[in-house]
Amino acid sequence: MKTVKELSVKEMQLTTGGKYYGNGVSCNKNGCTVDWSKAIGIIGNNAAANLTTGGAAGWNKG
């Protein structure tokens, strides 16, 4: 079991985070990283959706 520390309000206010883009990519002030276990599944889902819709799935409706 992992030991965790409860942060105070002041400590929480000092915490800075990054941005998660929902596709396995997350970025912070130090750069970006890819969680390939998530990205590969998302790439597969997007490819299947585009294949079955003739390329008109999701973000690519135009």
UniProtKB/Swiss-Prot annotation:
Q: Does the keyword Disulfide bond apply?
A: yes
The cellular component terms of Gene Ontology attached to this UniProt record, alphabetical and capped at eight, are: extracellular region
Cysteine disulfide partners in this protein: 27-32
According to its UniProt record, which protein family does this protein belong to?
A: Belongs to the bacteriocin class IIA/YGNGV family.
Q: What organism is recorded for this protein?
A: Carnobacterium maltaromaticum
Q: Which UniProt keywords apply?
A: Antibiotic, Antimicrobial, Bacteriocin, Disulfide bond, Secreted
Please give the Gene3D superfamilies that the UniProt record associates with this protein.
Answer: 1.20.5.130
The listed locations are: Secreted
What this chain does, per the entry, is described as: Inhibits the growth of several Gram-positive bacteria, especially the food-borne pathogen L.monocytogenes, but has no effect on the growth of a number of yeasts and Gram-negative bacteria.
User: Which residues lie in the propeptide?
Assistant: 1-18
Chief location: secreted
The UniProt entry, under InterPro entries, shows:
Bacteriocin_IIa, Bacteriocin_IIa_CS, Bacteriocin_IIa_dom_sf
Protein name stated in the entry: Bacteriocin piscicolin-126
Keyword set includes Nucleotidyltransferase: no
Biological process annotations from GO:
defense response to bacterium; killing of cells of another organism
